[in-house]
Amino acid sequence: MAEICDDALLLRRIPFSDTSLICHFLSKEHGRIALMARGARRPKSSFRASLEPLYALQISWRPGRTGMGTLVDVQRGQSLLEPSLSLHGLELLAIASRLFQEGDPHGFEETEAALVLLAERASQQGLLAAVWYLLDVAGWLGNLSHCWHCGAEAQQTMFWQHAQLLCESCGKGMPVSVGLRKSIVAVMSGGHVRFAARDAATWSEMIRLVLQEHSIKATDSFKG
């Protein structure tokens, strides 16, 4: 079968036999795919230096007749993050890997945009903003200016319950102040905001509860 070429992000590598890897990618035109990288674990394999996460990749593969395709070539482009952000970047890829399953036609552009958010925001806020963005494009978040249950305009203090922002009439739970809501909106719009430690912890917990509500395993930064 003819080879296919596409831009991609590497999500994960799984050892297969003593010499090969199963690689999961988010590709621009083909969504999430899994490919066999034959011989990639051998010391002299050309794949060893190029199969790295957090780089812009261009991959070529041959589709399988009945199952997994075979990776043919990988061209590694520029790094997508500064080294100091690598751990947060890997967490973001782990969450993207759980959001976008094999066969999903989406994921590449969404994850690429989330990585840009991570790169451009202050370190305290970057991962929060990037994951919040992914949850938003997944359709799991609403407008912070209204109750997500009844649609009423947000009050001074709202509550986070069952991964939703609720007014006092619709529920109770973890308080979410108007200041935090405004700060989240500002950060997501590109503003520079100094978060109090309490507000950052609350935003992180909001994210953790959304992941939990949708049975997505939390990464280390979001474990309660």
Can you describe what each PLM-predicted range is?
Residues 1-21, 26-224:
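Non-catalytic alpha-helical scaffolds and adjoining flexible linkers that form interface surfaces
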